Amino acid sequence: MTSRRGRAVGFIRDFQAFILKGNVVELAVAVIIGGAFNKIVSSFVGDLVMPLVNPLIPGGDWRTAVIGPGLKIGSFAGSVIDFLIIAFVLYLAIRAIERFKRKEEAVVAAAEPDVQQQMLATLERIADNLEAR
């Protein structure tokens, strides 16, 4: 009985450590946000872009285009366009985040002198003190 309880407690501790890792939590948040973002992009394409594009396409709504015996080429093309829009927006977001990180790192690097500069300043103060004596 004790060994079962010990294994159960060990399992629970391992599971808790796994869940509390930053990567797992971040991944869960990313999946949830990604699902919501998918709805936004689908609405953007379906409700804003396609009503502008459909009049230019002979036959109207291209998402319902079928080739041969049921090959839904329009639906596939729509999924590809949705993917490209999502990928492009994510690229822009990641690029903006990276630019912000670089600026932040530059500010931190400029604010903190490196070790050699600190040592040089300390040596100069020591030399000034010795000269003053």
UniProtKB/Swiss-Prot annotation:
Specify one Pfam family.
MscL
Q: Which residues cross the membrane?
A: 17-37, 73-93
An example of a GO molecular function for this protein is: mechanosensitive monoatomic ion channel activity
Listed under GO cellular component are: plasma membrane
Cellular localisation: Cell inner membrane
- Domain of life, per UniProt, equals Bacteria
What InterPro entries would the database entry show? MS_channel, MSC/AndL, MscL_channel
Membrane topology of the entry: Multi-pass membrane protein
Keyword line: Cell inner membrane, Cell membrane, Ion channel, Ion transport, Membrane, Transmembrane, Transmembrane helix, Transport
Note the subunit structure. Answer: Homopentamer.
The family annotation for this protein states: Belongs to the MscL family.
Give the NCBIfam families listed for this entry: mscL
The UniProt function text for this chain reads: Channel that opens in response to stretch forces in the membrane lipid bilayer. May participate in the regulation of osmotic pressure changes within the cell.
Q: What's the protein name?
A: Large-conductance mechanosensitive channel
Organism, by scientific name, is Synechococcus elongatus (strain ATCC 33912 / PCC 7942 / FACHB-805)
Gene it is expressed from: mscL
